Amino acid sequence: MKRMLVFGLLLGLLCIPLSVNAFELGVRGYYWLPELDGEVKVDESGITGTTIDFGDDLGMDDEEYPIVEAFVGLGDHHISVSAMQVDYSGSKTLSTNIIFKGETFTTDVASSLKYDMIDAEYQYDLIDLENILAGFSIGVIGKVKWVDGEVEIKSAIETAKETFTAPIPMVGAGVHVGLIADLLEVRVKGTGIGYSGNMLYDVMGDISLTPFPLVDIHGGYRIIHLDVDVDDVELKYDMSGPYVAVTVGF
């Protein structure tokens, strides 16, 4: 599949041999518990769609998702690639008719929201005081978020599906603060983009403990916000919630 090929190529970049002075190399696994809040509206052939709430109208519930990240760094340069698969589903007896992509639904419906998200990120540290006291750094971030998925609604007699695929460039900043040298650290980073009334941002922050060498344990919070109106599709979408993570680095 195209999205898996993209992920494989990006991971391949991380395997390019670096000099012995490589600053970091490792993997990080997250377990994220986000709340879902969003709505979608899809027009078709001049037929105006209904603004449909994922939870209230379609019965989608919150889910929990693993995220896998690989990272490498050399001096002030840091590269990471992460991947997540999202799969929401729900069923609902409609209290009023809804129109989605030109189709009218009047009774019981089943729905799904599925997508793969791959983040390829580069950070350059403008300020790096990692060798002073407990450590402190500030960096600028450039990121491409690749999203590939679909929204589907179906009843006993009708089915309608809208697919979406997009590489989204984003910029932002990251801050790292060491509280206790080699033991306790805080990390905050955020990226985003806004244009023509559309907006996307991805913000996360955590505190990590290093119980023994090469292993960090994290607890944090992440927010992904999307608000776009492109062609015949309007999508407002928020995922936000706490996460835990484990890093193994060298």
Could you describe each region identified by the protein language model?
Residues Y31, V72-L74, Y124-L126, V144, ...:
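Residue-level signature of outer-membrane beta-barrel architecture
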Residues E35-E63, Q85-M117, V147-A166, Y195, ...:
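Extracellular/periplasm-exposed beta-strand and loop segments of Gram-negative cell-envelope proteins
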Residues D57-G90, V109-F136, K189, F250:
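Outer-membrane beta-barrel transmembrane strands
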Residues L183-N198, I223:
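Transmembrane beta-strand segments that form the barrel wall of outer-membrane beta-barrel proteins
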Residues V27-G29, A70, I79-V81, Y122, ...:
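Membrane-embedded beta-strand positions of outer-membrane beta-barrel proteins
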Residues V20-F23, I127-S137, I180-L184, L214:
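Short loop/turn motifs that connect adjacent beta-strands in outer-membrane beta-barrel proteins
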Residues E24, D119-A120, L209, D238-F250:
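Outer-membrane beta-barrel "beta-signal"
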Residues I132, T165-P167, T191-D202:
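Solvent-exposed loop/turn segments connecting transmembrane beta-strands
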